A protein has these predicted regions:
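Bacterial Sec-type N-terminal signal peptides, specifically the leucine/valine-rich hydrophobic h-region
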Residues: 14-17
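Long, intrinsically disordered, low-complexity segments
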Residues: 19-20, 114-117, 249, 274, ...
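An aromatic- and glycine-enriched ligand-binding surface/loop that stacks and positions planar moieties
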Residues: 21-92, 165, 193, 213-220, ...
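Conserved, well-structured interaction surfaces
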Residues: 40-59, 63, 83-162, 172-211, ...
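C-terminal substrate/ligand-recognition segments
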Residues: 104, 108, 362-366, 370-515
Length: 619
């Protein structure tokens, strides 16, 4: 069975599935109460399943994934010429160079959808509380834990973006000043530590039933992420009093020094590792296949359905469907890959990011083909007559060399016999000719990008870690989107130890070594190839771990926070195109539409909710 799909309509089926003949008979079934329905665990599963609906907004380019990726070194969306594709009033450009402001739907979308998910969790928790007496104690504890951990994840995504957020653990209409980052961090840590022991532990027997749901492994992995990033969130031993004041700490240490944050991160990782629920896949790409539900490395995913007619919803331009392959691939990929939806030729990798891959690393672009012939410079605007003359010039000066070039790059690009994490090179037709785009230019993706504001259609490497549907079955991506991987747990542990956390390194364990060597699977001796390619990783140099995390987790929603943690977020020598370097940009601006709705404090006459430091508040 490929996946467990959570369908809200299933709840209605409990009372609606009767035949016409049954309806004609006068039978009194009584009026089932919520309490009586909750006595059956399968009904609790359906009820709690509703809370996952808002996770599907997280991976859109108009949502969390978009801003997390575009503001880091792993992703860029340049304005493409001719036609000013993706200009959008330079919205994407401002994310790329860190000059964003409060305008832009993504910030509003992130706020609204994560809050919506958290509020629904609180509402369902209230429903469970009302029915507590009719439920088994262990069932109640497990599903309360599931909802509280999922709520923590919604809040975490909001917190990661804005820092100061309206954190509530009950279903009430209540307005208070936004909670400060260190307070939010403390509440999240408390909630996760309290609930993790009650969560389902994944085994081979229950893996399918827990697929796409938060589990104990996820709770501890998210907790590890909070501890590892505590200092980047502004937490200190002195300002997190709540996190040190509890009676359910288990074996976590009290935070008396910065090193204690990292010790607890190690402990969280060890809980995931020692549970034996997860393992590193032999094939890195197994985690991102069209059907990746068999992966034992993926801890938490968004369960997708690529059928455009199934549960397709929009919020403005944002959709609840996975559109990563459509976002990144060149327009010409559609005919070669038999894609239902024409790609949008937008998102790509920043050139500096691609330099961090060894050409033997399958997560990268692979061997770089020879440089393609350059087409004649094209004026930004032309009359019809000038365009006709330009096309004649292309035919005379460019198309001939392009045909000759095609003969020298057979086996590259779409003809590659090997799978790579990024696409560069020619897009060939079935006859081995390079496909011309609508401008009669060869579709040859390259690593280089001319500029943020005037890139070519073919500029930038395209992310292909998620398997592309080449059978034309799905309008959108059917691959389940990965939110947490076991590989991340292994790397978080090693980094936490290097930062001063107490614990025993797992670097030489079979899983960790497999995680490294599988990246060189095309080589005769993968271990030697990895050591030669990335010596700083093998010797566990902290700066090299940042590079390795980039290679391993590209476009998986972790890079922005990684850069902030390593002090590289505003480093223009490390992150291409960054021009704004203010410290306050480590948080995003709270949307005006949110601030405008803030209630007024009757004592002060001011709004309860204030803008983040550095950004313009509402006049």
């Amino acid at each position: 069975m490929k996946k467990i799909v959570i369908i809200l309509a299933s709840m209605l089926a409990l009372v609606a599935m009767t035949s016409c003949e049954d309806l004609l008979e006068e039978k009194n079934y009584g009026n089932p109460t919520v309490e009586s329905m909750m006595s059956a665990e399968e009904n609790v599963v359906l009820l709690v399943g509703q809370a996952y609906a808002d996770t599907k907004w997280l991976h859109d380019h108009w949502g969390y994934w978009g801003v997390a990726s575009l503001t880091s070194d792993e992703c860029v969306c340049p304005v493409r010429m001719p036609g000013e594709h993706w200009k959008d009033n330079y919205y994407w450009t401002r994310l790329n160079n860190h000059n964003w402001n409060w305008m832009g739907d993504a910030f509003k979308n992130i706020w609204n959808t994560t809050i919506s998910g958290a509020v629904l969790c609180n509402k369902l928790l209230a429903t469970l509380a009302d029915a507590k007496e009719s439920m088994k104690a262990e069932v109640y504890a497990q599903y309360v834990g599931e909802l509280e951990v999922l709520r923590s994840y919604y809040y975490y995504m909001l917190f990661d973006c804005f820092g100061r957020i309206p954190y509530l653990e009950e279903f009430v209409d209540k307005t208070e000043p936004l909670m400060e980052p260190e307070q939010v961090w403390s509440h999240l840590v408390n909630c996760l530590e309290r609930n993790a022991p009650n969560m389902a532990v994944v085994t081979d027997a229950n893996r399918a039933a827990n697929y796409g749901r938060v589990t104990q492994g996820f709770a501890y992995a998210l907790l590890a992420r909070l501890y590892l990033n505590a200092e980047s969130f502004g937490c200190t031993p002195e300002n997190i009093g709540l996190a040190n004041n509890k009676d359910f700490r288990e074996d976590f240490v009290s935070i008396q020094s910065p090193a204690d944050f990292y010790t607890n991160a190690v402990k969280c990782c060890d809980k995931v590792i020692n549970a034996g629920s997860y393992s590193i896949e032999d094939d890195w790409f197994a985690n991102f296949k069209i059907d990746n539900s068999a992966s034992k490395e993926n801890i938490f995913v968004i369960v997708e359905n690529g059928n455009g007619e199934f549960d397709l919803r929009y919020i403005g331009s944002m959709s609840n469907k996975l559109r990563v392959p459509i976002l990144t691939l060149h327009y010409s990929h559609q005919s070669v890959y038999s894609m239902v939806e024409k790609p949008w030729n937008g998102f790509a990798a920043r050139p500096g990011f691609m330099e961090r891959y060894n050409e033997k690393d399958l997560r990268g672009p692979g061997p770089i083909p020879p440089a393609a012939p350059e087409p004649p410079a094209r004026p930004a605007k032309m009359t019809d007559a000038e365009l006709a003359e330009y096309n004649k010039k292309l035919e005379a000066e460019y198309h001939g060399p392009l045909k000759e070039y095609a003969k020298t790059v057979q086996g590259y690009g779409t003809q590659s016999a090997k799978q790579w994490g990024w696409f560069i090179g020619p897009v060939f037709d079935k006859n081995g000719e390079i496909i011309l785009d609508e401008n009669k230019i060869g579709s040859i993706c390259r690593i280089e990008i001319a500029s943020l504001e005037a890139a070519n259609w073919y500029d930038g490497a395209r992310c292909t870690k998620y398997e592309v549907d080449k059978a034309g079955q799905y309008q959108y991506a059917e691959n389940d989107f990965v939110l947490m991987r076991y590989a991340d747990v292994l790397w978080m542990k090693e980094e936490a130890i290097l930062r001063g956390g107490a614990g025993t390194s797992g670097f030489n364990t079979p899983d960790f070594q497999k995680m490294l060597t599988r990246t060189m699977a095309y080589e005769q001796n993968p271990k030697e190839a990895f050591a030669a390619a990335y010596p700083g990783v093998v010797t566990l140099q902290l700066e090299d771990i940042l590079d390795e995390r980039g290679r391993e987790f590209a476009w998986e929603c972790v890079r922005r926070r990684d850069l902030i943690r390593f002090g590289k977020f505003a480093d223009s020598d490390y992150v291409d195109y960054v021009t704004a370097k203010q410290k306050f940009r480590e948080w995003f601006p709270i949307p005006y539409s949110v601030l405008e709705k803030s209630k007024i404090n009757e004592e002060t006459g001011e709004r309860y909710w204030k803008q983040n430091e550095g950004y313009d508040d509402i006049p």
